[in-house]
């Protein structure tokens, strides 16, 4: 990986961290430890490795990211917002009643979320019918 690529990924990860702080400030709660410990990896996946398109979130040949530890949902929301899957203003609704950004990801509420996952150790994975994962 080139130095310029690494620099860009670090800058993007820093923006994603600010997105997490934005959600924490708006909601007053969240799992920051798990989120911050995985933000570099998830940023590198979405911005360097994965073949995804925010303008076509249901594209059949896309790569899929499954967050099995659903309590780390803020990392996924932060990166999806930075990637352009939804407006960043939605981050301000994290954890609020009827928000698309629940404490655990719900694939029926937000583009880019590939699976609904629960809390550890009770994690369950719900995939869409006929999914090719």
Predicted feature residues:
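Alpha-helical support elements that line or immediately flank enzyme active sites
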Residues: 74-86
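A glycine-rich helix N-cap at a beta->alpha junction
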Residues: 85-93
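An acidic/histidine-cluster motif and surrounding catalytic segment
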Residues: 92-112
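Conserved small/polar residues in nucleotide/adenosyl-binding loops
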Residues: 123-128
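N-terminal amphipathic, basic-rich helices that act as targeting or association modules
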Residues: 5-71
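A short, flexible low-complexity segment enriched in Lys/Arg and Gly/Pro that occurs
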Residues: 1-13, 93-99
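Membrane-interface loop-to-helix entry segments
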Residues: 117-120
